Every structure is written in structure tokens, then in C-alpha cells.
Amino acid sequence: TMYGTSSDGSVPPISDAELNLFLANLDCSGKRKELMRCALSLVGRVPYFWGGKSAPGWNSEWNTPKLVTAAGSSSTGTIRPYGLDCSGFTEWVYQTALGVTLYDGTWNQWDATHAITEEELLPGDLGFMAVPGTVPVNHVLLYAGKDADGNKLWVHCASGTGVVLNSPDYVTQYRRRNDVDLEGDLVPAALDVEEAGTSG
């Protein structure tokens, strides 16, 4: 299966070929495709870790045993494989793909975004389980498009699975990052000036 969990509960990583096919079938801007490329690159590779955050790029400490120090979880004070929490994942994706911050925590990410309708959802937009403050623990996800049956796909870092691409039914709030143009294409970062010039 392209997404979800295996019969043993593990999440298989998405292969490069599957990732390229998924991106080719997305009808969205280059910036949004880059968000999806970064997000999907962690599927099955990074575990859930309460309070887990990371600088942009691959973190060599992921999957190594670490003490959970963030308060508020039954895993606090235990040793777990290091990874990301839900908001740490969405922040990592935006930072790695575009150099844009979403801030730490679901509440701050809610405040950095504005409401959109379900019909306005585009890959890279955020989904939340609930309005902050209405549930003890919230959850944030990245919209990834729809599957062949029209089900909404979300890529997110969930407890129990780590980073996964699936179709949870609990997403009730749809949001988009404030003051960031996600509709343009990426400007190549390492364009060689000589290659860009014209030959006579």
C-alpha cells in the first residue's frame, strides 16, 4: 500500500519512486510540492517523540534513545527513540522546505494560520483535530491531497506510528499559514550563473 500502516503496525517508508509519482500527480504549486516532498520523505523514518523538535534537514539523532523531558505526557521521564511531535513535524517541514516558521506547539501554529474551507484545502495546508483549548491535547497535520477514492490524505507525526500518510477522520479545522505566498514556484537555490546565461 502507498500509505498507512502494515499488518504489524509499522509504517513502511515511501520509496523515491512512490514519492516522485505522488508529487507528479499533485495539482499544486512548486512550493506546495516541496512541502510535500519534505513531509513524505520522513514517512516511516521518524518516530513520534513528545516535545520532539529539530532544526531543518535530516537529524542524525532521530531514532536514538533519548529521555522525554517535556511535561504533559505519559511518556515524560521515559527513554524513547528520538523523533518529532506533531507540531515539531509541521514546523520541520515548513522550515526545511521553505525556510518559513510555523512556531512551536499546536496553539502557536493555530495563531500563525487562518481558517479556510474544506474546499480551499491545498497540499501543505494544516488540519487540526480541534480548536485549541477545547481538547486536552490537540493534533496538527499537513494536507497531502486525496486518494483514488476521494478520501483526504494527511501526513503527520502521530503517537504510535511516527510520521505516517493516512486518512484520519478526526480533522475538523482547516488552516493556512498567514502572510506566506505558497502559490509560487521555488527559485532554484544553487543556480549556476554561467548555466543561466545565454551563449552567443
What function would you assign to each model-found segment?
Residues 1-87, 95-97, 200:
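N-terminal capping segments
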Residues 1-3, 15, 31, 105-107, ...:
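General structural signal for secondary-structure boundaries
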Residues 2, 7, 49-50, 103, ...:
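Intrinsically disordered, low-complexity segments enriched in small/polar residues
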Residues 16-25, 37, 120-123, 148-151, ...:
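Polar/charged alpha-helical tracts
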Residues 67-69, 148, 173-177:
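Short, low-complexity, polar/charged sequence segments that are solvent-exposed and flexible
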Residues 91, 95-169:
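...with weaker cross-activation on analogous glycine-rich loops/strands in unrelated enzymes
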